[in-house]
């Protein structure tokens, strides 16, 4: 078994994308490869085949390998629920919530889980491609590190260092990061990859020559800036839009402090007939056909945030004028009458009034519901698939008019009697073409174009592998993976 790790000089340097690209590039060559990220901090997550929870980036990387996501691919997931605290998920299961200081002392236990998962993957896959987190040169985080060089040292693997030239200062990023590492860690870095380059490569060549002479390490390649690449963001909210046709549906999503699984909206962002707007703090909700309340890792505090921004008043006005309102997961809970958190799972224990638009209430319980599901929307009997990640148990008469009939016999969500309000626990439902089209028609869009989001994602994964093939040193990459040259 061989392990190759990708680390970055900064967050958003391109680590997730490069690991996805390498996984598909190796898979194309018949290599049995698996992705791995020791520790991830993100509110975007996916449900695995073994009934756990991992970061969505690792789920996409699994797709690049034609594998089902598994909890061993991301053994430690941290989901922030306050500015200083996070839910700690080990091997796909929430084990506790702790602040940053407490977690620092917990890292030795977390490292055991990381090494256990890495060992298990190594028993089934000859090549493991690992994604680091943030930067390996964060001085204050280096003690007991499990996400970057601490892991690389523990499993004795080579490292590639990637940097984003589009931000500027790429040579300072690479050299500075290298020099902040220990001598043994520096020796692990086997080469550099420069990401998001625009322009004439000949103008960059003197800098590449200097970098190799200065460090004694090769530049493995320079990846170009890709304008229309659309894969789920690991954590940051992706607000890029594609070109739209003349007649579009206006959809608004209020951005909440603890918004979770905002990748739910990627299919809408890419849809040619949808104008998707994310509205931040202090901004008024503009006229819209559909407002969607997103998932939340802290429903009661985000409800308070909505009200403090005056968005509750804007939503009421939107409904008076005939607009449609949808809630997903935490957004569904907000549509009800009460949200109760007796155990203090998402903050201080207590209860908060919801919007009272659906006759139901939610109690947050310690046991989280994690499922991949299929079913049919009550709208048009459209096929839908998605996943549940929630701690809430919702009850009330509103559920008698369900939004989804699931194949496992359960009903999900609710609709208002007047048809204006719809809520569901299902994340990812817009990725189902039939369900997406049905929901857009419900919101008022005529002549809806069907868009296959899964096909778009697959296309972009293939494009990434093409970039590796064209722009990176393939023989060196294979050598670092313990493979013979082609």
Swiss-Prot record:
* Pfam families, per database record: CbiA, GATase_3
Q: Which residues form the GATase cobBQ-type domain?
A: 248-435
Mind telling me which Gene3D superfamilies this protein's record contains? 3.40.50.880, P-loop containing nucleotide triphosphate hydrolases
What are the positions of the active site?
329 (nucleophile), 427
Top-level taxon in the UniProt lineage: Bacteria
- CDD domains from the UniProt entry: CobQ_N, GATase1_CobQ
Q: Name one GO biological process term.
A: cobalamin biosynthetic process
Molecular function GO labels:
ABC-type vitamin B12 transporter activity; catalytic activity
Which keywords belong to this entry? Answer: Cobalamin biosynthesis, Glutamine amidotransferase
Is Heme a UniProt keyword of this protein?
no
Fetch the InterPro entries from UniProt: Class_I_gatase-like (IPR029062), CobQ/CobB/MinD/ParA_Nub-bd_dom (IPR002586), CobQ_GATase1 (IPR033949), CobQ_N (IPR047045), CobQ_synth (IPR004459), GATase_3 (IPR011698), P-loop_NTPase (IPR027417)
Q: In which pathway does it act?
A: Cofactor biosynthesis; adenosylcobalamin biosynthesis
Which PANTHER family does the entry mention?
A: COBYRIC ACID SYNTHASE, DETHIOBIOTIN SYNTHETASE
Provide the family line. Answer: Belongs to the CobB/CobQ family. CobQ subfamily.
What's this protein's function? Answer: Catalyzes amidations at positions B, D, E, and G on adenosylcobyrinic A,C-diamide. NH(2) groups are provided by glutamine, and one molecule of ATP is hydrogenolyzed for each amidation.
What is this protein's name?
A: Cobyric acid synthase
Q: Which species is listed as the source?
A: Pseudomonas syringae pv. syringae (strain B728a)
Upper classification of the organism: Bacteria, Pseudomonadati, Pseudomonadota, Gammaproteobacteria, Pseudomonadales
